[in-house]
Curated annotation (Swiss-Prot):
Species name: Homo sapiens (Human)
Name of the encoding gene: COL19A1
Organism lineage string: Eukaryota, Metazoa, Chordata, Craniata, Vertebrata
Region annotation (Triple-helical region 5 (COL5)) ranges: 833-1012
Stated name of the protein: Collagen alpha-1(XIX) chain
Region (Triple-helical region 2 (COL2)): 370-429
Function, as annotated: May act as a cross-bridge between fibrils and other extracellular matrix molecules. Involved in skeletal myogenesis in the developing esophagus. May play a role in organization of the pericellular matrix or the sphinteric smooth muscle.
């Protein structure tokens, strides 16, 4: 079998690292058996603890208990009334480590102040306790019981004065640290006591686990439980804080986010009383005076265990409107229009009145991809393009003839630095580099290939390698001595450096590195092939004004655009627009000639002129001599030359390609209203609420919209016309990725790189927190008139209509069927008098005449409450509510894309005075007026309809014990119980009457000789009798125990099976000799009927067994002998009572 790289690495680590340690520590078992536990705020101190690595079990979540607010700032588990018993294997699927700690935070209520209850208990398959934490309110003690290796149950009782506040009906924290031979008890973050223990037995995790249960009847105890956790470390309980139960609350901050120093001084001593020993105040319950800046994102947490399915939540309040959505996908590129000819310069218009700033128009959709336009003139040199993948080297062309020397141009502006490109193909060897010593990896005497005399330059920085495979789990450390809690160790010395790991697999390409230092110039290389055209650069500086071009032809009128989409958020106010066209009013009277003005300042630089005509090609130079040289590196920039004389203006060039979109101009005056556009064809969505109810019964009303699919790509355009003039083409499409090059040597760390390319649009994030209502935006322009909408949802129920005309009196109907008396409503449906004759309802008669109003009857007695109905079907969506109060101003929207600047048109004639325009858009909401005078008292309204059923309230506080109820009706036949107790010996019955004389039998077969007795059958019969007596005595004792173990034992039996069928009677046999006493018959079938009333007291002096008395003093050990069931059942009676404390 061939081993791959990762397997070789694993095998190497297994051989060399595994022998280092052969012991198995608790830490490995902890990592294997305990999940990661969620820790809240200041629950643990941060000394030597990484909150992401705390492991353990939250028993409240494991028992699927619901949380509810028991105070304004605290939540508690709802214990309910069901038994809090679960299979242990479901709570601890992989068991518990040898050392662990239990942390609980609770408040004892009044009813449980003196009760004895189990905080946590683990039972084995025989329902015998293995681990128990008992809180006894009557004795004011805490007990910890566990099973030792010898099989005895050891009981450690903590009876300390410091434990008395645990029962004062206030919040307290109780913690127990269980180590191999030490038990420590903590209360309110203080160490109360510590006990040495015997070695504990292994725990059987195939039984049951109980929490917060009364010892008397196994029902949940009346406490408020905030926390019940098991940490998979015995030392974590010492790191618990008591910030939740401390009465030190952080004060209100002043306007500057500070806390008064007097408050800190006054509460420092009070807070220190809640801190554990040897711990400083600065580590505990600090009040943060001001919120700091957001930290860096934390490391991703490991995935948690799948939680239980939660119950459907109640309908939340309507959220505030969300933020504007992300920018939609870019539409198809618009068609490229023909270049219009430049019009003549218009005459200077009369000064117009400053128009009002118009509202920003709606952003139009991008048009479909148009055919390619005519080829434009060569544009200015653009900035360096994005890094291209290395293309294949072209064939070396012949050297061209030297051209005529052109005029020296002006020095251009320094372009922005280009983005770093990928590593190019290996270049030719450079000049001799400086030798450097690189440790023991490279030798300065190493030589290159024979054909290259000089050493190469330092290569570009190599790509970052992939992360190596994770190493195998290290050897297990030996178990350390149990440390003293609270002692903070000093910082250890720095460890020895680890062994250098094996080289990882080649990584994925890393991010482009920063630009390296400028290298020394290389040898002059051969002239390379012409590179591809870079992307279009930004507009260059404005050139000198060119001559007026020939007037262009009138362009073709574009098609009418589609109506805009949904009105977007109002954009930012645009820059001040240019002066609008002359007003439509009549020209005013000519004014008087003004005085000549002072000479104005120098005007701005004119626009760039049109490009000149291509120069004539130069003469062909002589053929060069020599071998083509290598491609040289780019030389240093030359000094700026002397500015040459200004050239003659060139001839008008051909029209250029349209430039980039200009900056949006200032808003002009509002135009006249256009003709009504085509209505938008909206898809028929129908009633969303009704559609949702067909799929789910508990959906929210809002539904995300469907995402449009991307349209198909347009077909190829028509082939272009052949152009005889060979000009440099536009930049071509990006070529396919080249073959990955070999991994270069690791380069030095470069400088900080330039900002990267903006990333792609990410996935849609979760719905954010509703923001503060924005200020009212400016009123948008009136939209186009749409088509008539679809019929709206059904309106609200109208008011009651007027009474219809009275109908004719109908014939009397037959008597109805008597109504059965059920649900306490019989008095409403009884038919009085006569015999109830069954009949069927007749056809409905016409409405009778309206009778006179009868006298007001006496108020009826309050009826019994009806049964709780089933939840109704979700109703249709109600009508829209009244418009809400105007919100605050929203954030300014993103500026719209700049429009294409239009060509200046010819000046038109002055028009006549137009008709009054349409009514303008509604103005912004005015300032709220003062409250008006209160109106007169209105007429008393009609009583409203009955409101909907309220939400279910939280569980109330248990009330006082009620009075003794009446005797209940006999219940249904219960399940088969455990074997009943053996009753006391009954009185000897009277002699029965002799039976009827039977028919004489035929002579029997001679019997077996008397001396051939089967001792095996006698032995079997004795064993059966002894077993029967033992089971009956055992059942008596179990029925008298009021413990969860006794309750669980009763649940272990199944239901009785159906009685078997009677067999056919056999033929009468011959009477044989008198046989031995028969065996015990099978248990008879259960009797039919309700249990009988208690019988009269028996005449025997022996009464029924009494309830167990209080445990007496321990007696001397008795002699070994037979086992009494009362002594063998529950080992707790032989537990070693080990008390401690004061």
């Amino acid at each position: 079998m061939r081993l791959t790289g990762p397997w070789k690495l694993w095998l190497w680590m297994s051989i060399f690292l595994l022998p280092a340690s052969t012991s198995v520590t608790v830490r490995d078992k902890t990592e294997e058996s305990c999940p990661i536990l969620r820790i809240e705020g200041h629950q643990l101190t941060y000394d030597n603890i990484n909150k992401l690595e705390v492991s353990g079990f939250d028993l409240g979540d494991s028992f699927s208990l619901r949380r509810a607010f028991c105070e304004s700032d605290k939540t508690c588990f709802k214990l309910g009334s069901a038994l809090l018993i679960r299979d242990t294997i479901k709570i601890f699927p992989k068991g518990l480590p040898e050392e662990y700690s239990v942390a609980a935070m609770f408040r004892v209520r009044r009813n449980a102040k003196k009760e004895r209850w189990f905080l946590w208990q683990v039972l084995n398959q025989q329902n015998i306790p293995q681990i128990s934490i008992v809180v006894d309110g009557g004795k004011k003690v805490v007990e910890f019981m566990f099973q030792a290796t010898e099989g005895d149950v050891l009981n450690y009782i903590f009876r300390n004065r410091e434990l008395r506040p645990l029962f004062d009906r206030q919040w307290h924290k109780l913690g127990i640290s269980i180590q191999s031979q030490v038990i420590s008890l903590y209360m309110d973050c203080n160490l109360i006591a510590r006990r040495q223990t015997d070695e504990k037995d292994t725990v059987d995790f195939h039984g049951r686990t109980v929490i917060a249960t009364r010892a008397s009847d196994g029902k949940p105890v009346d406490i408020e439980l905030h926390q019940l956790k098991i940490y998979c470390s015995a030392n974590l309980i010492a790191q618990e804080t008591c910030c939740e139960i401390s009465d030190t609350k952080c004060p209100e901050q002043d306007g500057f986010g500070n806390i008064a120093s007097s408050w800190v001084t006054a509460h420092a001593s009070k807070m220190s009383s809640y801190l554990p020993a040897k711990q400083e105040l600065k580590d505990q319950c600090q009040c943060i005076p001001n919120k700091g800046e957001a930290g860096l994102p934390g490391a991703p947490g490991s995935p948690g265990q799948k939680g239980h399915k939660g119950e459907p939540g109640e309908n939340g309040l309507h959220g505030a409107p969300g933020f504007p959505g992300q920018k939609g996908e870019q539409g198809f590129e618009g068609s490229k229009g023909e270049t219009g000819e430049k019009g003549e310069q218009g005459e200077k218009g009369d000064p117009a009145l400053a128009g009002l700033n118009g509202e920003n128009g709606l952003k139009g959709d991008l048009g479909p991809h148009g055919p390619p336009g005519p080829k434009g003139e060569k544009g200015d040199t653009g900035p360096p393009g994005p890094p291209a993948l290395p293309g294949s080297l072209g064939i070396q062309g012949p050297q061209g003839p030297p051209g005529k020397e052109g005029q020296r141009g002006r020095r251009g502006k320094t372009g922005p630095p280009g983005k770093p490109g990928p590593p190019g193909p290996p270049g030719p060897p450079g000049i001799q580099g400086i030798h450097q010593t690189l440790g023991g990896y490279y030798n300065k005497d190493n030589k290159g290939n024979d054909e290259h005399e000089a050493g190469g330059l330092k290569g570009d920085k190599g790509e970052t390698g992939l992360p190596g495979f994770p190493g195998s789990v290290g050897p297990k450390g030996q178990k350390g001595e149990p440390g003293e809690p609270f002692t903070k160790g000093e910082k250890g010395d720095r460890g020895e450096p680890g062994v250098i790991g094996s080289q990882g697999v080649k990584g994925e390409p890393g991010d482009p590195g920063p630009p390296g230092l400028i290298g020394s110039p290389g040898l002059k290389g051969q002239q390379g092939s012409a590179g591809s055209m870079g992307p279009r650069g930004p507009p260059g500086d404005v050139g000198l004004p060119g001559e007026h071009g020939i007037p262009g032809k009138q362009g073709i009128k574009g098609e009418k655009g589609d109506p805009g989409g949904i009105i977007g958020p109002p954009g930012l106010p645009g820059p001040k627009g240019e002066a609008g066209p002359p007003g439509k009013s009549l020209p005013g009277e000519p004014g008087l000639d003004g005085n000549p003005g002072a000479p104005g300042p120098r005007g701005p630089k004119g626009e760039r002129g049109l490009p000149g005509v291509h120069g004539s090609p130069g003469d062909i130079g002589p053929q060069g001599i020599g071998i083509p040289g290598r491609t040289g590196a780019q030389g240093p920039a030359g000094e700026p030359g002397i500015q040459g004389p200004r050239g003659l203006p060139g001839l008008p060039g051909t029209p250029g390609t349209p430039g980039n979109d200009g900056v949006p101009g200032r808003d002009g005056k509002p135009g006249l209203p256009g003709p009504p556009g085509d209505p938008i064809a909206l898809p028929l969505l129908g009633d969303i609420g009704a559609l949702l109810k067909n799929f789910c019964g508990n959906c929210q009303a809002s539904v995300p919209g469907l995402k449009s699919n991307k349209g198909e790509e347009g077909g190829a355009g028509e082939p272009g016309k052949y152009d005889s003039m060979a000009r440099k083409g536009d930049i071509g499409p990006r070529g396919p990725p080249g073959i990955p090059g070999r991994e270069g040597p690791k380069g030095s760390k470069g400088e900080r790189g330039y900002p990267g390319i903006p990333g792609e649009k990410g996935d849609e994030g979760l719905q954010g927190i509703p923001g503060i209502p924005g200020a009212p935006g400016p009123t948008g322009p009136p939209g186009l008139m749409g088509r008539t909408g679809h019929p709206g949802p059904t309106g609200a129920k109208g008011e009651k209509g007027s009474d219809g005309p009275p109908g004719k009196p109908g014939p009397p109907g037959p008597p109805g069927i008597p109504f059965n008396e059920r649900n306490g409503m019989s008095s409403l449906y009884k038919i009085k008098g006569g015999v109830n004759v069954p009949s069927y309802p007749g056809p409905p008669g016409p409405p009778g005449p309206k009778g006179d109003p009868g006298p007001v009857g006496e108020p009826g007695a309050m009826g019994l409450p009806g049964l709780e109905g089933f939840p109704g079907v979700k109703g249709d969506r109600g009508p829209a509510g009244p418009p809400g109060i105007a919100g605050m101003s929203g954030k300014p929207g993103a500026p719209g894309p700049p429009g294409v600047p239009g060509e200046p048109g010819e000046r038109g004639p002055v028009g006549d005075i137009g008709f009054p325009g349409p009514e303008g858009p509604s103005g912004k909401p005015g300032i709220n007026g003062k409250d008006g005078i209160p109106g007169a008292q209105g007429i008393m309204g009609k009583p409203g309809d009955r409101g909907p059923k309220g939400e279910r309230g939280d569980q109330g506080i248990p009330g006082d014990r009620g009075s003794q109820g009446e005797r209940g009706k006999p219940g249904l036949t219960g399940m088969k119980g455990a074997i009943g107790p053996m009753g006391p010996p009954g009185n000897k019955g009277s002699m029965g009457s002799p039976g009827h004389q039977g028919p004489p039998g035929s002579p029997g077969i001679p019997g077996i000789p008397a001396d051939a007795v089967s001792f095996e059958e006698i032995k079997k019969y004795i064993n059966q009798e002894v077993l029967r007596i033992f089971e009956e005595r055992m059942a008596v004792f179990l029925s008298q125990l009021k413990l969860p173990a006794a309750m669980l034992a009763a649940q272990a039996y199944g239901r009785p099976g159906p009685p078997g069928k009677d067999g056919l009677p056999g033929p009468p046999g011959d009477p044989g000799p008198q046989g031995y006493r028969g065996q015990k018959g099978e248990r008879g079938e259960p009797g039919i009927g309700l249990p009988g009333s208690p019988g009269l007291p028996g005449t025997s002096a022996l009464g029924l067994p009494g309830s167990p008395g209080a445990p007496g003093p321990q007696g001397p050990p008795g002699p070994s002998g037979r086992c009494n069931p009362e002594d063998c059942l529950y080992p707790v009676s032989h537990a070693h009572q080990r008390t401690g404390g004061n």
